Swiss-Prot record:
Gene Ontology annotations for the cellular component aspect, listed alphabetically: cytoplasm; cytosol; cytosolic small ribosomal subunit
Family per record: Belongs to the universal ribosomal protein uS9 family.
Protein name: Small ribosomal subunit protein uS9
Gene transcribed to yield this protein: rpsI
Keyword RNA-binding recorded: yes
Length: 130
């Protein structure tokens, strides 16, 4: 691709994103589609842009992203995590600012498994006294 590109892997729930950053004019490509085409939901787009807006690099970098697995919010979170890691590789001085905003830490929450004898992970069947 480019001679001076930076890479970051992001994960969230069951999604994994590979993010490549290079100097450019703010173009974001996710799985060969634009950000607006890929995420119909405005909140997901905002989540993806958060780290770039924080460090004021929205118009300075081009992003090429591939993401697999999970749903919309999981993929958006994985992309945000990947962008954060790639930005830290690009400029280590951004780490403290990104850490304060909480983007550096991987959100380790996973779906709790369904248990035998229960309807869902914790939901019990209705109890009848008589």
């Amino acid at each position: 691709m480019a001679e001076n590109q930076y890479y970051g892997t992001g994960r969230r729930k069951s999604s994994a994103a590979r993010v490549f950053i290079k100097p450019g004019n703010g173009k974001i490509v996710i799985n060969q589609r634009s950000l607006e085409q890929y995420f119909g939901r405005e909140t997901a787009r905002m989540v993806v842009r958060q780290p770039l807006e924080l460090v004021d690099m929205v118009e300075k970098l081009d992003l090429y992203i591939t993401v697999k697995g999970g749903g919309i919010s999981g993929q958006a979170g994985a992309i945000r995590h990947g962008i954060t890691r790639a930005l830290m590789e690009y400029d280590e001085s951004l780490r403290s600012e990104l850490r304060k905003a909480g983007f550096v830490t991987r959100d380790a929450r996973q779906v709790e498994r369904k248990k035998v004898g229960l309807r869902k992970a914790r939901r019990r069947p209705q109890f009848s006294k008589r």
